[in-house]
Amino acid sequence: MGKVSKSPGKGEKRIGKVGKKNGKSNAPTEGSNSGKASRFTMSERNLGLMQEIIRKDPESYKEEFLEQFNYFVQTMKLLHLQPEQSRQEMQSLVDSVLFLSGLAKHYPKESKQFSDSLFELLREQGAGLDPEVRMAFCKALVLLRNQDMIDPIILMETFFELVKVEDKVLRKFLLSSISAHLKRVYHKKKDVKMLGKIQNLCFSKMKDSRSIVARAAQLVCIDAFRRKFWRDARTANVIAQACFHKVAKIQVTSMKFFLGSENENGDAEDSDEMDSDAEDNTKTLKEVMTSFRNVKKTRKREKNVERAKKMISKKKKAKKEGRSKECNLMAIQSLYDPQEFVDRLFGAVEAKKMDNFEVRLFKIALCARIIGIHRLHTLSFYSYLHRFLQPKQRDVTKILLYAAQACHEMVPPDTVEQLIRVIANNFVTDRNSPEAMTVGINAIREILSNCPFAATEELLRDLSEYKTYKNKNVSMAARSLITLFRAVNPKLLARKDRGKPQEKDDEDEEYNGFARPKVHDFISGAEILDEDAADGEQGHLEEDGTDSELDVSDVDTDDVDTDDDADEPVAKKKRVEQKSVENDAESDADDEEIEDEEEMDDEEEEIEISDEEEEEIDDEAEEEAVVEEEASEAVEKDPKLKASKNSMDRIMTQEDFKNIKAYQLKKQLIGEKRLKKQMGKGRSQADERIVDEMAEKLELKRSSDGLARLSDIEHFYKKKRQSKEERMADVMAGRADEDYKFGRPKKNGAHVGRTNDQNSKKKVFAMVKNKIRGRNRQRSFRDQQKSLRHYLMRQSGRKPQ
């Protein structure tokens, strides 16, 4: 059993066949000048040419295909006996496999046997094959799948079995091929049934006892969720169950998926559009290499190409990392039972099992994130954090961040107060460094911004005294805490720190306590709506009344003397007429004529109203008008009454809500100005900076998931002075990524401020040839003569004068 030999007589037979089909002899003649073989010589190096010929006429060249197929079958039998042969020994088989896989759709019967042979060999001898041979077989199967010649589910099952082979390149190829097939099914075919089958297969593989197979299925599910192939609650919960896997690496992968933030500002919308814009404005690696291939190779150009390649790879990596941090908020919100999940995960944290500190920190972070988003009650979590709240603790700023994220308005104030006391006693003391004090006050501020009910007057006033501390960072952190409670509950502050009230009623305002939500009985901002529009709508509705009202008003109108100037009597007459009609309906049929006459007499008596009654009605109308006028004046003076009246008396339209939103934004800007005026006439730029930053943070929390960021905890207003070594290290690190050379920026984008001359050099010549020809025609005879003289002098090697 030595090396695999080529099929006997293969080349000669092919030559004869092809020559016969073309009606020519392909044997090289003695008078051949070039001495090259014919273009139809079917040796191992031109199987690609044979493949193109067979694609044009599969039936005529079926014999050549069968010849290669028989050679493949015989070689596979040998490979079953000796699977460990190298790539050099099996090169002919690899070429034959790629040849047959490209023509499989033209010969379905043979392709079925071909794919079965590949599946059988990979399942039985996959681990013992040469890596390159194994990779070639997998690529052939992927090609067959793309041609719909094999079942994708069977192929994926085979790929998951091959994941256990210790071949890093193969694993990467298998996972990428599965993701590519998902993308193809989702975007091109829109086959929901096939997506469901693949999803069920991946979910079953995540429960596999082999950790490497479970991890591969986990990576496929995470990638499909991020790329919106399987963005549903079922996928998110299956990934969440991997947080309790026995292998720590699988746990960390799932927890990283849930913990990755969308971005620092919480905005993940239009990320695909931003990525596409970035791709349009930057050159691809293929464009860079193509332009470099067609120019003279110099040292400068080689450096530029290397720099461009580094920049492109860096942007690809940044894009991949940005995609990996998406969708965590949606995944957390999709959990079926977040309370049970947090209790189980926190139980694993509290267990005596010795986990790595990084793994334990990931579990604490995930618990805090889910507690904060879902407003859960896991009170033992806060007391568990007490042991880690020490300035010398490893990653203490992250633990402070998790404590702030886990606090929300539904946590009992006494629990949060204990947490704040621990932070204040361990961090905000004179025996600690200014950095530790700053971090502690920042953490307390973030906790109290989520749980303002936990603040006590004593603690808050003690922390406010640090506004005059000698260190700038500590004093600014204390001022930011004061600024927060000026907007939340200024009564807890000392009188000198409260500032001026923003509104007239702020001094008498009652601030809600714990579990007492503030209920609005009107739409805030509805006072700006115009009442005339509402009156017009009501009048229009009154005109379009019901049929019954119209019928009643039309009864016996001939017998009633109408008066246009007296609206009230007319209304009373109509009510009287309605009563008479009802009485007519109740009369007996026998005495109908007599009772009709009597009722007509009674009706005439009731209609005749005396002058005294008319005067009384007029006085009542005037009194009602005066009362309504006074009430309208009171409503105009009090915006709350006007807003309440507009909210109750009209039906809001989309235009009304748009006007209210614009008014609220304007009012918010005015409120910020009033907040700055609270500082007094002698306010500093630092105070204004605190106010602006606090407003940005509050707006950020309202617009995103509402959780604190690590930059809020580690925020220092005045950075520590760096040493010379640190500054030089920053300089050297920046030079590797610099986009500037000799003071000029690198022009990589499509629109980066090039001049018209530079842009004209890149235009296609067909676009500018007419312009150049016209420019030459417009030149004077003197200019043409001068140009010709300079040209002739340059041609002769002389310098033009």
Swiss-Prot record:
GO biological process terms on file: cell differentiation; gonadal mesoderm development; protein transport; ribosomal large subunit biogenesis; ribosomal large subunit export from nucleus
Compositional bias per record (Acidic residues), positions renumbered to this chain: 544-568, 583-633
Gene Ontology terms: cellular component: nucleolus
Ranges of Polar residues composition bias in the record: 24-40
Keywords from the named record: Developmental protein, Differentiation, Gonadal differentiation, Nucleus, Protein transport, Ribosome biogenesis, Transport
Keyword Protein transport carried by entry: yes
Region of interest called Disordered, as start-end residue ranges on this chain: 1-40, 495-517, 536-647, 739-801
Phenotypic effect of disruption: Worms exhibit defects in hermaphrodite gonadogenesis and germline proliferation which are associated with a reduction in sheath cell number.
Disulfide bonds: none
Bilayer-spanning residue ranges: none
Cell compartment(s), UniProt: Nucleus
Bias (Basic residues): 770-779, 787-801
Keyword Membrane: no
Pfam families assigned to the protein according to its UniProt record, in alphabetical order: SDA1_C, SDA1_dom, SDA1_HEAT
InterPro entries, A to Z: ARM-type_fold (IPR016024), Sda1 (IPR027312), SDA1_C (IPR048292), SDA1_MD (IPR007949), SDA1_N (IPR012977)
Entry's family note: Belongs to the SDA1 family.
Functional note: Required for 60S pre-ribosomal subunits export to the cytoplasm. Required for normal somatic gonad development and for regulation of germline development and proliferation.
Protein name listed in UniProt: Protein SDA1 homolog
Protein source organism: Caenorhabditis elegans
